Curated annotation (Swiss-Prot):
Residues 1-46 form a transit peptide. May play an important role in maintaining the flux of carbon towards starch formation. This is Probable fructokinase-6, chloroplastic. Signal peptide: none annotated. It catalyses: D-fructose + ATP = D-fructose 6-phosphate + ADP + H(+). It comes from Arabidopsis thaliana (Mouse-ear cress). GO terms for biological process: carbohydrate biosynthetic process; fatty acid biosynthetic process; fructose metabolic process; starch biosynthetic process. It is found in: Plastid, Chloroplast. It holds the Pfam family PfkB.
Length: 384
């Protein structure tokens, strides 16, 4: 058993979660800190459930959907790194939210994706829905809440581009998605259904999440899980650990960070393969451990290994893990046989690592997500 867009500058004159990459050979300590829209505002044209993805020459081709479920919000990113939120002279607003980032990342790489979630019936909510549409993401599964605002997150950047977050929620619209609002047709016809853990924090979204994943599983859809731990959003660390692990054994693909291994195993060594293997449940097809600039580790029932990352100048690490997920899911959606072929899986993970590396060179998450052409160019230039 396993262990249970365009940016605009705004001027403004808690508890945090810090993410820092680590190398296996350099074992530095790891710390964990603690309704439907108006038709006039959005296009309601419905995409085919087997999407029309853009190819490199601008033509369209059919591609299986990756449906992403969860939160979409506004990140406010400081224009100057190395300052506290109180001292930051200005912020740029950028669309974000891990599942939405993955959906846009897949579409930008030429795949087909859809997003299911809830935003406020406010200017930010309409902006986010239109950003999805503008990035060729099916937004038919989006819902709008007239009584709650779109979630906001203020991001503090260190001089090295690492992040701390302050969230404005409680409640925000993403927490209020109800099971009755789900687009089950979209869910059941997906190739991959991807989600995080933030949608498990409160009702009614928790029940909607569980129902959506259950429907996908029963329809034979591959389930992809990135816990994306944001500890300040949870009532307690114990509650976060319990809920994150409560759906662990239903997932087919899981991506975690070194920090999340430490958290989920209550302090065990994330560099020890025996520790990581405790998180590999019997029905899991692929477990991925991201290591920032060092790359990633991969584990299947039959093989495991590491794929080195690309070294780049870091501006902002926001969205890097989501870009990595988009990179690997875009490959798997078209060919699940990669899971049985180590050589080809390694090539797909090199592609995913490059997606993450390119994202940290630009501020914000969605604005930084790369195209397939940019990824291939970076790989060609990389020194092995």
């Amino acid at each position: 058993m396993a262990l249970q867009a365009t940016t605009t500058t705004f001027c403004f004159s808690g508890p945090t979660f810090r993410s820092t990459p680590h190398s296996l050979t350099s074992k530095r300590p790891i710390s964990i800190k603690a309704t439907t829209s108006s038709p006039s505002r959005l296009s309601n044209s419905r995409s085919n459930l087997k999407g029309r993805a853009l190819s490199s020459d601008g033509s369209t081709q059919e591609s299986p959907y990756v449906v992403c479920f969860g939160e979409m919000l506004i990140d406010f990113v400081p224009t100057t790194s190395g300052l506290s939120l109180a001292d930051a002279p200005a912020f740029k607003k950028a669309p974000g939210g891990a599942p939405a980032n993955v959906a846009v990342g897949i579409a930008r790489l030429g795949g087909s994706s859809a997003f299911i979630g809830k935003v406020g019936e406010d200017e930010f909510g309409y902006m986010l829905a239109n950003i999805l549409k503008d990035n060729n993401v099916n937004n038919d599964g989006m819902r709008f809440d007239p009584g709650a605002r779109t979630a906001l997150a203020f991001v503090t950047l260190t001089n090295e581009g690492e992040r701390e977050f302050m969230f404005y929620r409680n409640p925000s619209a993403d927490m209020l998605l109800e099971e009755s609002e789900l687009d089950f047709d979209l869910i059941k016809k997906a190739k991959i259904f991807h989600y995080g853990s933030i949608s498990l924090i409160t009702e009614p979204c928790k029940s909607a999440h569980i129902s959506a994943a259950k429907a996908a599983k029963e329809a034979g859809v591959i389930l992809s899980y990135d816990p994306n731990l944001r500890l300040p959003l949870w009532p307690s660390a114990d509650n976060a650990r319990e809920e994150i692990l409560s759906i662990w054994e239903t997932a087919d693909i899981i991506k975690i960070s070194e920090e999340e291994i430490v958290f989920l195993t209550k302090g065990e060594d994330p560099y020890d393969d025996n520790v990581v293997r405790k998180l590999f449940h019997p029905k899991l097809k692929l477990l991925l451990v991201t290591e920032g600039p060092e790359g990633c580790r991969y584990y299947t029932k039959d093989f495991s290994g590491r794929v080195h990352g690309l070294k780049v100048d870091v501006v902002d690490t926001t969205g890097a893990g989501d870009a990595f997920v988009a990179g690997i899911l875009s490959q798997l959606a078209n060919d699940l046989s990669l899971l049985q072929d180590e050589e080809r899986l390694r090539e797909a993970l090199m592609f995913a690592n490059a997606c993450g590396a390119l994202t940290v060179k630009v501020r914000g998450a969605i604005p930084a997500l790369p195209t397939k052409e940019a990824v291939h160019e970076a790989l060609l230039k990389a020194v092995v």
